[in-house]
Amino acid sequence: MSLFDDTAVSKQLAQVRIVMVNTTLPANIGSALRAMKTMGLSKLVLVSPKTYPHPDIQALAAGAQDLLEQVEIVETLEEAIKDCHLVFGTSARSRTIPWPLLDVRPASKEAIKAAAQGQQIAIVFGREDRGLTNEELALANYHLTIPVNSDYGVLNIAQAIQVVCYELRMSVLEQKEVASDAGQMPLAQGQSMQWDEPLVTQQQMEEFYPHLEKMLTEIEFLDPENPRLLPLRLRRLFGRIQLDRMEYHLLRGIFSRVQALTSGKWKKASSDKEDQSNA
């Protein structure tokens, strides 16, 4: 039995969505829904599932029919996370470029801390046989891993979702317990930082990166024929920072000014005055 109001816990967890990419087995979808319902999560997004709908989904989602009715189906991962501010991509393997990597427990704490600040969060799970592609993982701010037995580190997707959902719930309960204790202290601890601008969404960042790469190409810093790992490293950099709206528009304004200067479409005011005096 929970010591806290389940309605309040579920309200915070409602800002966290579970995303399953190209899931093959309908049973995994049904089991994932039941795992989510047990821990108080409610939003599941399926990216191009191989088989949907299917009787096995209903059978395995026993008791979670309300969640099943709310499942969202989309064609791409970009669409699934477009309004999210913070994205975690699950990964069991090291990649070409090291990415900010968190075990499930600290990752859950970060997710719940962000949710408490009004952010939308996505936890993305890949295919049963090969997980997420490098391109899909590059859309995440952080990679998330579950520290399993190195001799037999095998979890199916539904089991992994159960572990993650449990850790998310425990993070909410722990946060509420800390807040309750802090209220009795002279100086409350663990308070969230109040920011003056909202963070940008993943959809906005997907407009940001092409602009950045176009500007870098125009100043001949990026070779589009041989970009090497530069675009990926830039994604890692800005994904780690999490831009707010003001920073986003500031940087895009700088990119546009650099492009204008490079193309000769913009001149400094002093140059304009000098031209006028010589006329």
Indicate where each model-derived feature is located.
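Post-transcriptional modification and biogenesis factors for structured RNAs
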Residues: 1-279
